[in-house]
From Swiss-Prot:
Its EC number is 3.5.4.4. This is Adenosine deaminase. Pentostatin binds at residues 14-16, 141, 170, 200, 221, 278. The gene is add. GO terms for cellular component: cytosol. GO terms for biological process: adenosine catabolic process; hypoxanthine salvage; inosine biosynthetic process; nucleotide metabolic process; purine ribonucleoside monophosphate biosynthetic process. The record marks 221 as: Important for catalytic activity. Substrate binds at residues 14, 16, 170, 279. Keywords: Hydrolase, Metal-binding, Nucleotide metabolism, Zinc. It holds the Pfam family A_deaminase. Belongs to the metallo-dependent hydrolases superfamily. Adenosine and AMP deaminases family. Adenosine deaminase subfamily.
């Protein structure tokens, strides 16, 4: 269960993987995009996981209809704004919303820098209107190669004062981290944090690479760390965060069952692991479900769930004073 007197964070939440089905329908109609179905009920199976997918790439294909309807920058702004409202409705106090501007721009050849500006505008408006805290993480989608990632990074860095970190996501097997060393040097030189999707489709070596070569202080998913005792020790000793996404890992067939998910063992090992959603609209879940259903099914005790919630605050890309303010606000709820 969620401890209401502590801040609730979601640090691994894809803005472009959380586009409402109703919004997809409306934008599809507006921009003349031929969708596979034209009602909420019939479109849902195309944009939401119905049963576990055989691979990460198959899972990611469910996101494609959401970005296919982003016909102009106002559509990107709308989706960003709605993401903040969705976080509020999920009882989240602080969200880090990540997005790939190249992926969002691709279908309708939007200017990548314009997409970043629109998302920044939408999230800032949402924070103003809905009263929760949110920050942005820019994603380089390695699926599209190193040149596209440089274009993406240039766009992200053009708004670096409104972005807290840069991530590397996408095809972990086909585009290993060693191709992006120079990209992340630019990220660190710009003073931004680094989080990397690793140890999801590829093995522990991908996580070592993210930490040593790319400068990651947090790892997205990281489930394969369980196969490397030295890595487990390193993560605990150096306080490298693991952004765990229980239902997502089940739906991508990264784990066979929640009962075999390594999150419980990460926490027992003293690793700073926290609970997150990933792509809530695609998964058909929200953060309370992860705490109240998925985490107990993964074998976590109530104390471990509470620890994971605390870890989320510790790992947040926030200043100490911002974290203290969130703690004080949550404490008033009792």
């Amino acid at each position: 269960m969620i401890t209401s007197s502590l801040p609730l964070t979601d640090l691994h939440r894809h803005l472009d993987g959380n586009i409402r089905t109703q919004t997809i329908l409306e934008l599809g109609q507006k921009f003349g995009v031929k969708l596979p179905a034209n009602t909420l009920q019939t479109l849902t199976p195309y944009v939401q996981i119905v049963e576990a997918e055989p691979s990460l790439v198959a899972f990611l294909s469910k996101l494609d209809w959401g970005v296919a309807v982003l016909g102009d920058l106002d559509a990107c702004r709308r989706v960003a704004y709605e993401n903040v409202e969705d976080a509020l409705n999920a009882r989240i106090d602080y969200a880090e919303l990540r997005f790939s501007p190249y992926y969002m721009a691709m279908k309708h050849s939007l200017p990548v820098t314009g997409v970043v500006e629109a998302v920044v505008d939408g999230v800032r408006a949402g924070v103003r209107d809905f009263g929760i805290q949110a920050n942005l993480i820019g994603i380089m989608s390695r699926t599209f190669g190193t040149d596209a990632c440089q274009q993406e990074l240039d766009a992200i860095l053009s708004q670096k004062n409104h972005i807290v970190a840069v991530d590397l996501a996408g095809d972990e097997l086909g585009q290993p981290g060693d191709r992006f060393i120079q990209h992340f040097k630019q990220v660190r030189d710009a003073g931004l944090h680094v989080t990397v999707h690793a140890g999801e489709a590829a093995g522990p070596e991908s996580m070592w690479q993210a930490i040593r070569d790319l400068g990651a202080t947090r790892i997205g998913h990281g489930v394969k760390a369980i196969h490397d005792p030295k890595l487990m020790d390193y993560l605990a000793q150096h306080r490298i965060g693991i952004e765990s996404c229980l239902t997502s890992n089940l739906q991508t067939s990264t784990v066979d069952s929640l009962a075999t998910h390594p999150l419980k063992r990460f926490l027992e090992h003293g690793i700073l692991a926290c609970i997150n959603t990933d792509d809530p609209a695609v998964e058909g879940i929200e953060l309370p479900y992860e705490y109240e259903v998925a985490a107990p099914q993964a074998g976590l005790s109530q104390e471990q769930i509470r620890q994971a919630q605390l870890n989320g605050l510790e790992l947040a890309f926030l200043s100490d004073s911002e974290k203290k303010a969130l703690l004080a606000k949550a404490a008033l709820r009792g």
